[in-house]
């Protein structure tokens, strides 16, 4: 089953940061699509097992961005 979640973040400001984060998340097994909106601070991810929301949020955090709840 494919899930889609939008994660709100802060700190993503450049196209290079978007490219790096997109590559990092896309390399996760189970991730199908990543869309990042700099203006709204949204990272929308389509994924299935073994990827999960917690592991995706951890990748964003490990890349240096904050998750906003």
Predicted segments with their positions:
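Short amphipathic alpha-helices in soluble, non-transmembrane regions
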Residues: 20-25, 55-63
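Short, surface-exposed ligand-recognition loops at beta-strand->loop->(often short) alpha-helix junctions
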Residues: 7-17
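A generic structural motif
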Residues: 41-46
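Short acidic amphipathic segments
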Residues: 22-37
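Compositionally biased, disordered extreme N-termini, encompassing classical targeting presequences
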Residues: 1-6
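Conserved short beta-strand edge segments in small beta-sheet-based binding/regulatory domains
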Residues: 64-69
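Helix N-cap motif at beta-to-alpha junctions
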Residues: 48-53
């Amino acid at each position: 089953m494919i899930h889609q979640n939008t994660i709100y973040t802060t700190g993503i400001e450049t196209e290079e940061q978007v490219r790096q984060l997109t590559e990092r998340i896309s390399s996760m097994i189970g991730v199908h699509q990543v869309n990042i909106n700099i203006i709204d601070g949204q990272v929308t991810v389509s994924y299935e097992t073994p990827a999960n929301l917690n592991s995706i949020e951890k990748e964003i955090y490990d890349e240096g961005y904050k998750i906003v709840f």
